Swiss-Prot record:
<comment type="function">
    <text>Mitogen-activated protein kinase kinase kinase; part of cell wall integrity (CWI) signaling pathway composed of pkcA, the bck1-mkk2-mpka MAPK cascade and the downstream rlmA transcription regulator. The CWI signaling pathway regulates cell wall integrity and pyomelanin formation. CWI also controls oxidative stress response, gliotoxin production, iron adaptation and asexual development. Finally, CWI is constitutively required for A.fumigatus to cope with the temperature increase found in the mammalian lung environment, during infection.</text>
</comment>
<feature type="compositionally biased region" description="Basic and acidic residues">
    <location>
        <begin position="1128"/>
        <end position="1140"/>
    </location>
</feature>
<feature type="region of interest" description="Disordered">
    <location>
        <begin position="1"/>
        <end position="73"/>
    </location>
</feature>
<dbReference type="InterPro" id="IPR050538">
    <property type="entry name" value="MAP_kinase_kinase_kinase"/>
</dbReference>
<dbReference type="InterPro" id="IPR008271">
    <property type="entry name" value="Ser/Thr_kinase_AS"/>
</dbReference>
<keyword id="KW-0547">Nucleotide-binding</keyword>
<dbReference type="Pfam" id="PF00069">
    <property type="entry name" value="Pkinase"/>
</dbReference>
<feature type="compositionally biased region" description="Polar residues">
    <location>
        <begin position="897"/>
        <end position="907"/>
    </location>
</feature>
<dbReference type="InterPro" id="IPR011009">
    <property type="entry name" value="Kinase-like_dom_sf"/>
</dbReference>
<dbReference type="GO" id="GO:0004672">
    <property type="term" value="F:protein kinase activity"/>
</dbReference>
<feature type="compositionally biased region" description="Basic and acidic residues">
    <location>
        <begin position="1189"/>
        <end position="1198"/>
    </location>
</feature>
<feature type="compositionally biased region" description="Polar residues">
    <location>
        <begin position="220"/>
        <end position="248"/>
    </location>
</feature>
<feature type="region of interest" description="Disordered">
    <location>
        <begin position="832"/>
        <end position="1144"/>
    </location>
</feature>
<feature type="compositionally biased region" description="Pro residues">
    <location>
        <begin position="44"/>
        <end position="60"/>
    </location>
</feature>
<feature type="compositionally biased region" description="Basic and acidic residues">
    <location>
        <begin position="871"/>
        <end position="885"/>
    </location>
</feature>
<dbReference type="GO" id="GO:0000165">
    <property type="term" value="P:MAPK cascade"/>
</dbReference>
<feature type="compositionally biased region" description="Basic and acidic residues">
    <location>
        <begin position="832"/>
        <end position="841"/>
    </location>
</feature>
Amino acid sequence: MDGQRQQTYIPAPPPPSATQPSQSHMLSLPPPPPRHLPTQPQGVMPPPPPGPPPGPPPGPGYGASKLANSQLQQQNNLGWQHNWARQALSQGFLPPPPPPPMVPTNQAYGRQTSFSVPNADGPITSATYVPGSNTFGAGVGIPGFDAHTRPSYEAYGTMSGSDRIRGPVHHLYESSGGDGSAYKRDGTVPPTPSARTMPSSLALHDNAQESVASSLPGATAQNHQSQTGQTNEPTKSPSHRQNNSNTLLGGMSPSEAAVQWPLDRVLLWLAKNGFSRDWQETFKTLQIEGADFLDIGHGANGRGNFNKMHNEVFPQLAKECEASGTGWDKERELGEGKRMRRLIRQIHDDDSFDVGIPAQKRRESQAPSEGAPDTSPKLSHEPQSAGPHSGTIENSPNLRAPQLAQPHRHSVQMRSVTLPIPTTHDIASSDFSQTDGISSRSDFSRSVLVGLGVDHRRQSPSMSSDNGNLVAPFRSYEDSPKSGSPATQHATLNQGLSSSSTGDLSVKYEHSRGNSSDSTMGRRYYESRKGQETIRPSPQEMCSRQWTGETSSSYPKEHKGIFNFLKKRSKGGDSTHPSPEEPNLESPTSPVNLRQNGPHLPYTKPSFNASDMSLGERPSSASMSDHERLRGKPAQKGKKWSFVTLDGWNYRLVDITDMDSVETLRAAICHNLGIADWASAQIFLTEPGQSDHEEPLNDTMLALCRRTKSDSIGSLKLFVRGTHLQPVPNHVPNFAGLGVPLPDKHTASPTHHLPRKPLDDEALSRIPPQPQTGPASPQLGIRPQQPKTPAAKFPARDAPQHTEGMSPVEGDQQVGISPEPDKADLLARHEEHKREVERKQKAYLSSKGPPQPRNDSYGETGYRRAGVIDFDERRVSPYEDKKADTLVPLRKPPSAPQESYTLTRINSLRKKDGDRPRAQPAVQTHGLGAVLASMGRMTSAIGTPAPSVPTPTSAGGKQTNFGSFGSPTQGNTKSAPQSSPEKESLDNPGNPAEHRHTKSTAPEIPKPTLQSRKSYGPEFDFEETEVSFQRSPRPQDDSDEDSDDGLFAIPLSNNKASTKENDSGSGTSEAQKRTEKPALTVNTESRLRKGLSVSFRSPSATRESFADANGDSGGREGASFLMAASPEDERPTPRRDSFARGDIWASRPPVEGVIDNLDDFFPDIDLDAPYLDGQGVSPPSSPANRAPPENDLHKKENQPSSSYTGEMNANAGDTLGSNEPTLKPQGGDVVARRNINRSGGGLTRGKSIREVAKGANQASRSRSIHTGNQKSGEILRRKSTKMFGAKIMQIKPKPGSRLSQLDPIPQNNTPSGVPQRQPTFRIIRGQLIGKGTYGRVYLGINADNGEVLAVKQVEINPRLAGQDTDRVKEMVAAMDQEIDTMQHLEHPNIVQYLGCERGEFSISIYLEYISGGSIGSCLRKHGKFEESVVKSLTRQTLSGLAYLHDQGILHRDLKADNILLDLDGTCKISDFGISKKTDDIYGNDSSNSMQGSVFWMAPEVIQSQGQGYSAKVDIWSLGCVVLEMFAGRRPWSKEEAIGAIFKLGSLSQAPPIPDDVSMTISPAALAFMYDCFTVPYRDSSERPTAQTLLTRHPFCEEDPNYNFLDTELYAKIRHVL
């Protein structure tokens, strides 16, 4: 039979193929078993079940079977008979019996031994296996149909004798395949793979087989033909050199390598793996391809061809680099060479010749060069599934010997035929196949499969034909007429399987199977394939792998290829991790699944020859269970997962197990998220809920995080910020190999996922409202909204998230909706909620279809990073707070101290009357006024002129005057416009004001309210007093300064009747003016009076002012303001809790800011309590108090901007006499008594702390105003009073109590005019404003002269003092040293030490107060400084440093935090806690120890082992400060302390200057830093001195055009308060 078959069918006529089309439909008919049963004497193989045989193509498989044992031959023959029978039946030809001579031939070669009879475990392992109902087509074990018409197919005639016997069949197939219909029709008959369709290795094996079977007459000719044809193909590549030893390169023969790796593909591989154009040109020039290319990484010795690299590649590369202008960098290129060798080794190890080449690349390389359907991208490589290989020999696991000849095939080693092929290379493979394949292969294959990475992307040697493509599979799919055909479906699956998400498609251009059950289960195709597809890898494939030296271990490595990241990348949407929304997912049993993975699997591993590939595992259900087995294995292998997110809301799981390179990892992460430009994407570490991310991970940190933080539970979470998302290729239709478009998979975006229902009303209500008419584009819609709502703070890309949860359309519509005005407040209050919503929306939007280019988004992101938006919303400018405070009383005005207790009580009862309509109080005012007036006269010895009553009553306006004088005006001032009324009242205290008031009689009507206050009695006088607004006469008229008024600490109604009359007249006008801006007016009045030294006003006046403060604000405006509220009510919300507030910490306000906010900085002190006038120690206060009221008014008028401040100052300065008295009513008597007691029984003039402070500040301010320079620095820079040698009393109130309720402020006993030998200063300590080396710094004020100062205090806990005496001694010694060192220093750039006070458990140092804070705090808050500022600050610091060194003082702790920056640009060196005085300032002192801050230390400080160091360590520290100012961060910013110590001490390295600094600053600045960083080798003599740098260095030259007020830094820090 066999002989007949050979004779009859060797020249298989093509015509029968024409019949095959019809036969293709008959494939389902089972072949007649009886005919062949007899031919199978051994019956080793069970008779194939009826039905179309999906078994492997007869070609190689048959050849292998013939080479195999007689049993195998018989089995093969049986298979042949089945296949032939079917074909014969369909074609009308009887299947020829297998040729018996083949067995002896095979036996002669000993191949039979290498191929064992299939085990019972693998019942259907032979190539003749008849597929069952659930197994059919190329994907289920039957090789894809081969392109018989191809000339290479004829070369297939070179197959072994058995193949030649089947030759007729081949011919038959070829003829039928000519039109492709044969394949379609004869789907049951596995196409005989031609040399092309089958891997070169297979073809070679065939040759070898034929050579072996050359004894057969007809075979030899064919054999020679096939060999010749095959040899020619591989020789295409000029670099296709065969190893003489015929060893395989990476599992490929040299010919195969030439086909697999043509030059184009090598160049593409280089490009994809990031090799420069120079490398590509080098390879192109040297024509490195095929075996030469693979030799580079995996030469004969397994280590790569180093000679070639160094003798040819690198020299040529150097030329290319020079030619291209890149420049030759040997280290870089050597590193690239190493990387290349490693990547090429991966190609060998992974059995994937495409390693490192994206699937797309592979697609190109795999595209059928022989006319295979290029149009089917998926088919390009995937169709190769069962393809010719499986069909040939792979399907019959027992027939592997032929592959051994593979490596020799191209070398045309006929000797391969003569030599026992199995022994050459197949020994390993045959052993493997027999042992592992049959017995242990299932375990082995499983373990191997688990590790497989991207086999489907790589074509194993067996997978690919000599051309690099499995032509047969393509043709089979292509030719298959219907998508329903197995081949078609397989192809379709490939397309559909491309990846679960379109994003995947964009990432991998290969046809990954997404719908397979494997993908559903997350298994790899090869893994699932093992169970699903029974096609066993041909022995050839196994041989090729074995020849590459691959073992099972190599398989697991496969997934480590660079490609792997592509596969992993698709995890989010990959077939291995399909999203639940994927519509194409099919049940595990779906034939689609079976075919999906099939194409690659058989070729993925030789292990598939094992019995575990038996049919029993083919059912998808089996694959399902198999998957579950396999699924656990990756975890066992240490799978590493990472969660990645674009918005912090939606996370995708990415498998980063095999991402060995950072580029691969980045690309995988970005492709998973749909970011096309992964190179520019930023990756941050994140945690759920984290919204702010500081610095993106660089490559090193990313690799470290992957290595240390990633694990099997996804502990590593990454936030990715890309320029824009990669558009999902939804528009690119998926095509099966047959060109049938497949439904596109849903992208990861919500639009393509399962449809989502629109948000319900409740959900929508939670979203910031937006107009329904918003534009459809979410981003565009949001833009208009931004200016209106807080949403504007967020980048547009975030904003779109408002539509979270909506359908894309709805989301678009609603995104643009602007919030309704009525909800603006709600949005502001719920910003956090809004952020969350926006975050969700961003995620939603980002996933919605191809995202629109977010040009604005990026900019907004940058803007957001700048912190402008969020910062502004969260923090209200303290400066604004100050303004608000200005408008309202800054403190609760205490009761007027002047009033008697009775009056106080009466006024307290009547206090609310002022709130009543002015008209009513006016009437009552007279009645009560008389009573109260008499009472006031009696108690306070104050006579209120009768005119006072008439004054208010006479004219409403005049009453208004009266009232205006009172607090009503003051209250009005607060509420009324500041500048104009104030100016008017101040400017026109006289008639003009009166005219106004007369005009505004209505406002005067409220003034009866003032009268109502007058009804209290004393208010009458008070009002009149106020009426005496006139600056000159009245204040001076206060001849009563020493009157009883002082006794009661109540401002005397020093205004005489005339004064009152004047007040009534001018006061009226003033009241009107004050009505316009009463607060200022009132303050001015009080200020005037105080200026006249009449510090006390009649209680009524005080009361009025108090009432005004409470509610008379309406008095000025008339009935419009009925201020019934108490002073507390009118008082604004507290401006600030304290200096310690986080956002204001270390930002010290200017002195005037402190004065204006004394209550905030000295919260527990009654700043308005009067105390005896100090000794002559407080010159600033007395002149201020004595200053004529005109001065105050003039100041206020000149300073409209600070009018409120002026007003406050006036009021505060007036304290007791101010319109807004602050003492409690009962305080008056007490204070009076105290004054009497303290003064020795005599009456003295009382002053309050507020008065003194404001007086001093006013005088200083007036000076600055007159000079035309309003810089706060000038005010601050006034000379402070030194207190060394004086007696200092520090007053610090107990928490929660006011000084007025505690012991009185210490009074000076000596008369003010008599100087004391030892002056006494009373220092009041306020809020904490900073921390020093050993102590805390508090705000202080000198109660005697009003100077603001800083109190540095070290307090020792008495309980700890006994325990840690050494620490206490150290602290005390440090403070003493600081005091002794600094008390005599005076320099504009050194903080002035004013005095000290030693207590039992504390030491206090009084320092000059510097506003603005330290340079370090400015750097942290505002970033690096511009060079002009750095230059100025450096020059000033050098000046101070030169002065210190001249005085013999080493600072030793110079850093940005210890240099204070005034608001006028002056910097001062501070914190001399560890400074030291020495005689030889620039000589090394061995007693100098290691002190200071590590990052600013000089090397000699750390290295000082008995040698010591000099003051030049301060020069080094100064260089560090300059670097700190330029860089915006400390020196050694990337080092920890220990690292800096090592580099300084051991390596004597200077802190590195960052590139962004060195590239932007001037050469002079660089030179200055380098000079400061001069590293001493023996001593520091080479480092310049401070004086040298100051006078000679170009960087320290003064710039005449420099003005700090014009700098950006000043603009940032000017509003400190």
